[in-house]
Amino acid sequence: QGVVWVGCLPKTAGLRLPEGANKSIALAFFKELGDYAYSRGTVIGMEPNPPIYNTNYINDTESAFDLIKKVDSKGFLLNLDLGTMIQNEEDVGELTGRVSLISHVHISEPGLKPIEERAIHSELKDLLKKEGYDRFISIEMGKTNDIGILENAMAYVRRFSDDL
């Protein structure tokens, strides 16, 4: 089962740090935030965004994992974004042994274009299944006036996630 949100405004904001910013401040901030979230039975999801979104901090999945490891909080996990992985040409193998650090999976495309059927989706599904992932999988896509595009994306992701 899952929840479908239609017509929501984007909730993801890329990070753009000023030149020379003290990144260690982020560690303490995210640690406090993550620990608080965990104490309340939830998590904060760190989603990397590639530079195509005008970001310069946490631009790939590996740097997000590095930050999550440094923050070291059960309430600060990865929001895995397939659009980022596709844009950066990242390999699903990078996730091996770290699926427990994923709080949420976005099936998406670079630029939030309509979802395309891709081999990376079945590779990810196999890894998530193997490592016992049991959390949310959702579609992240830009606005469309063509309901058929949305229906196709939902049917595709349902096939993908029902097999987990």
Q: Where are each of the predicted segments found?
A:
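Histidine-acidic metal/acid-base catalytic patches
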Residues: 27, 31-32, 39, 58-164
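Active-site acidic/histidine proton-transfer and metal-coordination neighborhood
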Residues: 1-77
